[in-house]
């Protein structure tokens, strides 16, 4: 690394076949700096190769910071643990969209706007009726969110003045669509939003009330779900967020962009992992079986894997998992299940054993955010097919903040990754009768 004279930049040097290239080093406010390789292909006639974008920064962002080695997660500079304990989801949503925590008046106005936009067009009910009763709620939600662009044709050609309203509309309508997806999947009537309730209470109301039975929100359950939403609101440039940015880079309407994020989130390696944790705990069955399954997880020839352990970014304890572990105990204690919930007992003993095992220590495999969230959902009465739907409700805030930031970035270009072509070189076409 050498010091450059161009605006006090530092440069990295890359030598290709005897030719030296000076690559600017872009300074991060905290964390790893970035080598700017954007001119390499033009000047050196080479592309860079980075499968999975493990070492590539695709954008500049001021929204979320992660230090995976130290177990740090910040939203706009605020520690995730502080936000989970002291804030609420819509305050965090405001922070994500606008960059600062709101004043009392700003918070009040923001929550009123979200409540105002929580209804969806009545014609959307007809779309739900086209799905078979066994349809997965994520499939229904994916289609419903994408269809919103048909109800807001003005956003097919959006501009900067639309960013705020678009974010509010999306944050407001996603819980309604999520609850509608659930109600349809179990054959119950849709429940309309109630603007006298706050964001989390309203979602629980739409999920569990019926036209003939009111749902009384337990404050412990509400607080737990509020924390879960905050903890899942954003996580830097993960698969679904990158998908939203890539779709948005083409100028696609925001509802279409969010639907692509939902599709990516649905993958079992991304948003579906907490459901896999529940299935794994059920398979283990009892505490006595834990050593056997830990041994299976360490056997490279055994297909069994411990779900909820390890993370692409975190090489220490996931800070979100630490919050959720305590939240899980609070919820189960409130419901009278703390000492007799078999899934929690297996999870706690499995974690304790894994954290003392050299295999997991050497590989830095610690519990992640998915390890305890599924147990909380299950205790709340939320079925496993809804786990990823709730993830999408929370992550919509991050997607919209990232989408807005992308469109406000003067350096933004349409995304166009390159490839290393390893296929055939030119071949001559032969008529079908000449082929063997």
Curated annotation (Swiss-Prot):
Enzymatic reactions: oxaloacetate + acetyl-CoA + H2O = citrate + CoA + H(+)
Active site per UniProt: 311, 370
Gene Ontology molecular functions: citrate (Si)-synthase activity
Cellular component per GO, a single term: cytoplasm
UniProt keyword GTP-binding, yes or no: no
InterPro entries: Citrate_synth-like_lrg_a-sub, Citrate_synth-like_sm_a-sub, Citrate_synthase, Citrate_synthase_AS, Citrate_synthase_bac-typ, Citrate_synthase_sf, Citrate_synthase_typ-I
GO biological process: tricarboxylic acid cycle
Keywords: Allosteric enzyme, Transferase, Tricarboxylic acid cycle
Activity control summary: Allosterically inhibited by NADH.
UniProt record similarity statement: Belongs to the citrate synthase family.
Protein name per its UniProtKB record: Citrate synthase
